[in-house]
Structure formats: C-alpha cells, structure tokens
C-alpha cells in the first residue's frame, strides 16, 4: 500500500500531468514494488504503460499486469552521468544510445509517440535519458534515487521543449483514498506473494531480510 499510494500520487497528483486515456507512460523498474503498481494504475486510467526491466524473466510479469511492452535496459549501455556538452564525441555517443532507447518505445507502440509521463525512481543513471525521451510538454516525475542522487540535466531539453521535472513524495489523504478505491474495486492486484499468520511473523521478517 505504501508504494501504491506513492505511485498513485506520482501519476495522478500533479495536474495537468495526470494519466489520461491514451497517454504513454514509461515506467522504470516495472517488476518492482513501485513499478508493478504504476503499470496497473496507468492501465486503470486508460493509459499505455511501457515497462523498463533489468532481466528477461521479468517480462511476463509486467505484461500480465497490463504493460503494453517491455524494454530491457541491459540492451543499452549509455547509462550514467551525461558527458559534458563541450565533449562532442562523448555527447554524440550518449545521444546515440538515448535515441535508440526512444526508438524502442516507438517500436512497441507502433507509432512515433513519446511518453507524456516518465515514472522515475532510479535517478542518477537514468534521469538524462528520461528527460530526453519525455514528450514535448510532458513530465518526468521522480520519488527516489536508487542509483544515486547526483543526476545531470541538459537544460536545453527542459526549456526548448517545455518539459517538467517534478519531485513527488508519498501521498496525501486524497491520493491514498484514490489508490485504495482502485484496490477495493479489483482494478489493481496488490501482488502479494504470500500471506502469513500472526504466529509466522518472524518468518516473514526473515524472508524480507533475505530479500
């Protein structure tokens, strides 16, 4: 529920950049806690979720949740800090990788349509690409920095194409209720792997500790 409410606020809490029918939404970490909730929220709102995964064995899981397609980030190697804009060769290499990633989105959709919303939480290694592939007038919304906090931004993409970089943290009462309503209506699967009796509480803690 924690990650569900967080995801709901990211996708539905920042007007006018809320998920609308037909909107393309790029979801980083599609098979994780945040991502699995985001895919389902996007689908429930009539959007088209593209999940980014780290292993092929996560593809089926994301597709069953409602993703329109998946991109394996290991198929690309341009991640990390942006090269300096005066480093022509380095920047050209990065741009080639970012464009290839963007094309992978278009290939899934079958049209040249970029994400109106990019659902971010890796941070440092992915922010440059997220901003690049985000559609003109779209939003990159971020709630964490699981790969690091010192992200680099090419400001030209923000001002020339009117893109929004929005921070988001947890949820208020309205957003929590919005998520719980989707859960109660059966539109979202909480993705529980197991349920435990009170007596098995130590076992559940041990399993979480071991990831």
Give, region by region, the residue ranges found by the protein language model:
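Surface-exposed amphipathic alpha-helices with a cationic face
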Residues: 36-44
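C-terminal hydrophobic helical "lid"/dimerization subdomain
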Residues: 128-131, 173-211
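Short, glycine/polar-rich helix-capping loops at beta-to-alpha or helix-loop-helix junctions
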Residues: 53-61, 149-155, 176-177
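A glycine-rich, Thr/Ser-enriched phosphate-binding loop motif common to dinucleotide/cofactor-binding enzymes
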Residues: 1-15, 27-31, 37, 92-100
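Short helix-loop-beta connector
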Residues: 16-24, 111-113
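Rossmann-fold dehydrogenase core element
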Residues: 136-143, 153-192
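Helix-to-beta-strand junctions that scaffold the AdoMet/dcAdoMet cofactor pocket
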Residues: 20, 134-135
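Adenosine-nucleotide cofactor-binding segment
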Residues: 43-125
């Amino acid at each position: 529920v924690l990650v569900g409410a967080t995801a709901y606020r990211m996708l539905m809490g920042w007007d006018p950049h809320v998920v609308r029918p037909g909107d393309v939404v790029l979801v980083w970490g599609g098979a994780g806690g945040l991502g699995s909730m985001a895919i389902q929220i996007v689908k429930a709102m009539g959007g088209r979720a593209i999940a980014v995964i780290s292993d092929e064995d996560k593809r089926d899981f994301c597709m069953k949740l409602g993703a329109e397609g998946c991109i394996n980030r290991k198929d690309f190697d341009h991640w990390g800090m942006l090269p300096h804009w005066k480093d022509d060769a380095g920047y050209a290499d990065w741009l080639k990788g970012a464009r290839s990633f963007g094309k992978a989105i278009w290939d899934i959709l079958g049209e040249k349509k970029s994400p109106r919303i990019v659902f971010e939480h890796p941070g440092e290694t992915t922010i440059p690409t997220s901003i690049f592939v985000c559609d003109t007038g779209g939003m990159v919304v971020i709630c964490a920095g699981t790969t690091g906090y010192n992200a680099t931004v090419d400001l030209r993409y923000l001002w020339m194409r009117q893109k929004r970089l929005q921070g988001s943290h947890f949820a208020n009462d309205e957003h929590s209720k919005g998520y719980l309503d989707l859960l109660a209506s059966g539109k979202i699967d909480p993705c529980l792997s197991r349920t435990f009796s009170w007596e098995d509480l130590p076992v559940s803690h041990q399993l979480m500790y071991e990831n």
